[in-house]
Structure formats: C-alpha cells, structure tokens
Amino acid sequence: MELKKFIRDIPDFPKKGIIFKDITPLLKDKEAFNLAIEKMKDYYKDFDIDYIVGIEARGFIIGTPLALALNKGFIPIRKPGKLPAERISTSYELEYGTNEIEIHRDAIQPGDKILLVDDLLATGGTVKAAIELINKLQGEIVSLGFLIELVDLKGREKLEGYDVFTLLQE
C-alpha cells in the first residue's frame, strides 16, 4: 500500500503561500492508518524507550496509537493554557508565525528515555522547542519520529546528533 496517496495537499492553508499536508485521508482509512503505525512500531520496537511524547495536535494522533503499540506511556506537549498542573513553556517560530508550547513540570523525570513524535517535520522549529522542554526536565531523547518530512525545508539539519525517523518524505 502506497501511504503517500493518503496525504493530500491543501494550498494556501493556514496562510497564503503554505501548502498544508492533510493527513485526514490517511487517518480515515483504517488500513492505511494501521500500516503507518505498524511501520513506525517496527522501526522502534528494539529501542529502549520509557515514554512517547507527542506535540499538539497531530502529534497526539500519531503518538497515542504508537505508544499503545509499543506498550509505553504517552506524554502530551500542549499549546498554552491547556495543561492543568504546574508546567514549563517555550516559544518558537514556525513557517507561518510564532507559537508557544508547554509540558507538565512533573511529566518527565531525569533520565527518562523519550521518543518524541509529531506528524510533520518541516523547518524543525516546533520539534526544537519540544526538545528544549524535554532537556529542561532532563529527559534523554532516544529518537525523533515523524509521519512526513518536507525535505526541501531542511528541518532535519537542525536536528543533528539525534536519530530521526520519517515514514514519508516529500
């Protein structure tokens, strides 16, 4: 099954000049969605991982079933004001503006082995901010996993020194 055919391009969303990679057709198709998670599980099955950390919102969609498939817990990184307990935050730039993300201060203990996942690797700004949060909590990032990588935006270059897995490259 060719998973790329389940990714649809939406021009000028969320802003003019941006081509949004819509994963909802992949999510809707149970066989394609299951295959995507299984392929990621196969890559990570022998890694020493304590937790899957997913970045809001589509990182939750990939991270939660992957955590279940690997029999690991899931930790969310969220947009501001969405987490109820004490939290830490950081700001970052993305290809169409700026944003902020947060994590519970007690979510990760020093030395916890983390697989950080998101749906898309573009410029690397969001994942670098998430890495900063995990590092502040002294978690050990084992790998970075993405459903899609936009190769032309060179986000991988910002992630030197990390194991990076992408299921699809565009």
Curated annotation (Swiss-Prot):
Q: Which CDD domains match?
A: PRTases_typeI
Q: Which GO terms describe its biological process?
A: adenine salvage; AMP salvage; purine ribonucleoside salvage
What does the UniProt entry say about where the protein is found? Cytoplasm
The protein's UniProt keywords, in alphabetical order, are: Cytoplasm, Glycosyltransferase, Purine salvage, Transferase
The reaction(s) annotated as catalysed by this protein in its Swiss-Prot or TrEMBL entry are: AMP + diphosphate = 5-phospho-alpha-D-ribose 1-diphosphate + adenine
- The record's EC number reads 2.4.2.7
Question: Which pathway is it part of?
Answer: Purine metabolism; AMP biosynthesis via salvage pathway; AMP from adenine: step 1/1
Pull one GO CC term from this UniProt entry.
cytoplasm
Give the GO molecular function terms.
adenine binding; adenine phosphoribosyltransferase activity; AMP binding
Primary location? cytoplasm
- What's one Pfam family here? Pribosyltran
The record's disulfide annotation reads none
What's its job? Answer: Catalyzes a salvage reaction resulting in the formation of AMP, that is energically less costly than de novo synthesis.
| Quaternary context | Homodimer.
**Family designation:** Belongs to the purine/pyrimidine phosphoribosyltransferase family.
Q: Which NCBIfam families match?
A: apt, PRK02304.1-2, PRK02304.1-3, PRK02304.1-5
Q: What is this protein's record name?
A: Adenine phosphoribosyltransferase
- Source organism of this protein record: Halothermothrix orenii (strain H 168 / OCM 544 / DSM 9562)
